[in-house]
Amino acid sequence: MSSSPRSPDARPLKVRVKSARTRSSSSQKWLQRQLNDPYVARAKREGWRSRAAFKLIEMDEKLHVLKRGMRIVDLGAAPGGWSQVAAKKIGAAEGQGKIVAIDLLEMDAVTGVMFAQMDFLDPTAPERLFAMLDGKADLVMSDMAANTTGHKKTDHLKIIALVELAADFARQVLAPGGAFIAKVFQGGTEGTLLADLKRDYAQVRHLKPAASRADSAELYLVATGFRGSADRTEDETDEA
C-alpha cells in the first residue's frame, strides 16, 4: 500500500471531455473532473476501488485507528474502497480480525471481508452483526453521504441526520474503547451531534484529508475511546 496520499504522481495532461447530446452539463463536468483527478488515476493503478481509499489511509496515518486483529463495521461500504484499506491494515486476509461491510447495494467481494446487504437501521441489524463478528465491534466507519439536492443548507441537514443515525448504531454495536469515523459537511449545525459524541467518546477530532476535493465541504469526524452505552444510559437517567 502506498502511504503518501499527499503526494500523488504528477498530474497528467488535462483531458477535455467532448460534449454529447445525451449527456447533461453536470454529468459532463463530473466525468471531466474524474478524468483529471490524480487520486482517481492512482486508485486505478494501485487497485483501490475508489479514490476514497486515500482518505482513510491518510486519517489512519495521522491517528493510527486501524490495528491488527480489530473487528470493524463499514457502513455504506460499496464499492468497497474503505473495506479494502481496513482489510489490509488489520490483516483480515491472514485471519487477523474481522470486517463486516454493510450496504443496501450489492458489492463485489473483498478478500477477508464479510458482506451483508441490508439496511443498518433494521432492528435486527445489531444482532446479525454480533453473530458475524463474534462480539461487538472495535470500529464503526461510515463514508455514507445522503443524496444531494443542490441546496447547501438542506444537504447539510440531511448528511447530519444520516451521521446521527450512524452514531446511534455505533453506540449499539461498539465495545468500550471503540472508535467511530464518519463523513460530515461543514455547515454550522453540528452542535448537538458534537455534544453527543463528546459525551460518548474520550476524544473527538475533525480532519479534512488531502484526497478530499478542495472545493468540497466534507470533513471527517474521528471519535475514539468509546465510553460504553451503559455509561450514556446512566448519564441520561441522572439528567432526567
Curated annotation (Swiss-Prot):
Main location: cytoplasm
UniProt binding sites for S-adenosyl-L-methionine: 80, 82, 103, 119, 143
Active site per the UniProt annotation: 183 (proton acceptor)
Subcellular compartments: Cytoplasm
Keyword Cytoplasm: yes
Reactions it catalyzes: uridine(2552) in 23S rRNA + S-adenosyl-L-methionine = 2'-O-methyluridine(2552) in 23S rRNA + S-adenosyl-L-homocysteine + H(+)
GO cellular component terms given for this protein: cytoplasm
EC annotation from Swiss-Prot or TrEMBL: 2.1.1.166
Keyword S-adenosyl-L-methionine among record annotations: yes
Entry-linked Gene3D superfamilies: Vaccinia Virus protein VP39
UniProt keywords, alphabetically: Cytoplasm, Methyltransferase, rRNA processing, S-adenosyl-L-methionine, Transferase
GO MF terms, alphabetically ordered: rRNA (uridine-2'-O-)-methyltransferase activity
Top-level taxonomic group: Bacteria
Region (Disordered): 1-28
Pfam families: FtsJ (PF01728)
Family from the record: Belongs to the class I-like SAM-binding methyltransferase superfamily. RNA methyltransferase RlmE family.
Function: Specifically methylates the uridine in position 2552 of 23S rRNA at the 2'-O position of the ribose in the fully assembled 50S ribosomal subunit.
Protein name: Ribosomal RNA large subunit methyltransferase E
Source organism (scientific name): Azorhizobium caulinodans (strain ATCC 43989 / DSM 5975 / JCM 20966 / LMG 6465 / NBRC 14845 / NCIMB 13405 / ORS 571)
